[in-house]
Amino acid sequence: MLDLGLTKMALIGVVALVVLGPERLPRVARTAGALFGRAQRYINDVKAEVTREIELDELRRMKSEFEAAATNVETSVQDNLRKHESELNDAWNSGTSVSPSIAGGALEDVGNAGNTSWPGSTPAAGAKRKNWRVRQTAMPTWYKRATTRRTRVQSGAARVARHTPATMRRPTRFF
C-alpha cells in the first residue's frame, strides 16, 4: 500500500517525538495503529465484497446461459416430437399406407416373419433360459451367511466345546 522503508519509518518516529513529545507519543502511536488497522480491515472487506459481486455476476451469467441452452434443447425435442407425432398420425389416419421411413423396413419383414424363426426359440433353449434366470436371482451362500440374522446364538466357550474332538475333552464326572 504505502512504500515505507526502515529509514522513512525512523524519520517519521523522530519527527513525531520532537513534535508530540515523549508523554503523548505512545498514546498517539496506539491510536494511529488502531486507525491504520481499521483502514486495512475496511479495504480488505471492500475487496472481498467486490470479488463476491464479480463471482455472483459470473454465476448469474452462467445460469442464464444454461437456462437458454436448456430451453433450446427443450424446444428442439418438442419440435422433433411434434414432427414424428404428425407423421405417425398421418400414417395412422391413412390406414394401410405406411411410409418405410416410419416403419423402419418392417413392411418387408412382415412377409418373411412366418418363414424365419428365432434361433433360441426351441423348448430346450427356453428351459435353459429359465434356469439361467433362476441362477441369476439366487442369493449366494456367502451373502446369506454374512447378512442373515442368527437364530441359534452360542457363546464362544460353547462353540469351542462343540467343535473340540472327544479325545481332547476333559472327562465329565457325575456323582
Swiss-Prot record:
One Gene Ontology cellular component: TAT protein transport complex
Highest taxon of source: Bacteria
GO biological process: protein transport by the Tat complex
Lipid bilayer topology: Single-pass membrane protein
Localization per Swiss-Prot or TrEMBL: Cell inner membrane
Gene Ontology terms for molecular function: protein transmembrane transporter activity
Region (Disordered): 104-132, 155-175
Pfam families per record: TatA_B_E
Location, primary (coarse class): membrane
Keywords for this protein: Cell inner membrane, Cell membrane, Membrane, Protein transport, Translocation, Transmembrane, Transmembrane helix, Transport
Stored InterPro entries: TatA/B/E (IPR003369), TatB (IPR018448)
Signal sequence annotation: none
Transmembrane region(s): 1-21
Intrachain S-S bonds: none
Function per UniProt: Part of the twin-arginine translocation (Tat) system that transports large folded proteins containing a characteristic twin-arginine motif in their signal peptide across membranes. Together with TatC, TatB is part of a receptor directly interacting with Tat signal peptides. TatB may form an oligomeric binding site that transiently accommodates folded Tat precursor proteins before their translocation.
PANTHER family per UniProt: SEC-INDEPENDENT PROTEIN TRANSLOCASE PROTEIN TATA, CHLOROPLASTIC
Family (UniProt): Belongs to the TatB family.
Subunit structure: The Tat system comprises two distinct complexes: a TatABC complex, containing multiple copies of TatA, TatB and TatC subunits, and a separate TatA complex, containing only TatA subunits. Substrates initially bind to the TatABC complex, which probably triggers association of the separate TatA complex to form the active translocon.
Protein name: Sec-independent protein translocase protein TatB
